[in-house]
A protein has these predicted regions:
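Active-site acidic/histidine proton-transfer and metal-coordination neighborhood
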Residues: 10-12, 16, 23-27, 94-194, ...
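Catalytic-core regions built around general acid/base machinery
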Residues: 68-75, 147-154, 242-246
Length: 278
């Protein structure tokens, strides 16, 4: 081998080694990928999800078909890690009417019981919606916290976390606000369910992750771009490398659930593996 060939080969090897080192952090076994499935079991679809390497699923409640879902999940060894509270938009904890707030709280309690029954650990909750003078930002903050705190004994009894998600509802559009809201709930049972794509519109997703820190217990996986809105993973403005870096810094471990469409669950599996280093 001549000197020129040696130097070229060595430089190439060093570059590959550097790339390998830069990509060496893997979240395999640390982040568990899942998809959302609704309220009814679909054994064929669940089997495909399992075959594609997903670690679990997330359902909706109330209305979850608890016993049939438990049976299929057990047969396939595909756990349901939690549920989304399906009524939080229509029947809100922040509604101006106290009777509606009570109804929403009771529905959330049922969702918590359903989550426990299927072996889950959490309920995803949107705490309210800013609609006007009778339901402004402060109303959403105060009313939702009042209702959530009434459910803290149940959360502890069931060992179920109430995980707050920020969406395009006029509430907590700054990561510092969301952090402070979680802290105002004043309970280890109330933490963050951070949606990576939802909040990219208001501040880079990796900044949200950094500011929320260890308050984030679970992730919704989405992408969003200023030109194309919600889109397949990897086609928006989310900087996935920076997202991974911040997740590593906060020592995140837990569930990451895809919400959205990538043209097939097989493509979703591949994209999640690539973008989350699974």
């Amino acid at each position: 081998m001549n000197r020129r060939h040696f130097l070229t080969t060595t430089a190439g090897s060093l570059a590959l080694a550097g790339l390998s080192h830069a990509q060496s952090k893997s979240f395999r076994g640390i982040i568990h990928k899942a998809v959302k499935v609704g309220t009814a079991p679909d054994e064929k679809h669940f089997q495909r999800v399992k075959d594609l390497g997903f670690d679990g699923i997330e359902g909706n409640a109330p209305g979850l078909q608890v016993e049939p879902m438990k049976k299929v999940c057990a047969q396939l060894d595909l756990p349901m890690h939690g549920v989304v509270y399906s009524k939080h938009w229509q029947v809100r904890l922040s509604d101006r009417n106290p009777e509606v707030r009570e109804k929403s709280r009771n529905g959330l309690a049922q969702a918590m019981r359903d989550a426990k029954a299927v072996g889950g650990t959490s309920v995803l909750l949107v705490p309210g919606k800013v609609t006007g003078e009778q339901e402004n930002h402060q109303h959403v903050w105060d009313r939702s916290i009042e209702q959530i705190q009434q459910l803290l004994p149940l959360a502890e009894e069931l060992n179920i976390h109430i995980l707050i998600e920020t969406v395009w509802n006029g509430f907590c559009y700054k990561p510092e606000q969301f952090r402070d809201y979680i802290d105002a709930c004043d309970s280890p049972w109330v933490q963050a369910y951070f949606d990576i794509g939802n909040m990219q519109r208001f501040a880079p997703s990796h900044e949200w992750i950094r500011i929320l820190g260890k308050r984030t217990l679970k992730l919704d996986i989405k992408d969003w771009g200023s030109k194309n809105g919600f889109c397949p993973l990897g086609q928006g403005d989310v900087d996935w490398k920076k997202v991974r870096n911040e997740l590593e810094k906060i020592e995140f471990s837990g569930w990451a659930t895809r919400e959205g469409n990538d043209g097939g669950v097989d493509k979703t599996a591949k994209l999640m593996n690539e973008l989350l280093a699974l």
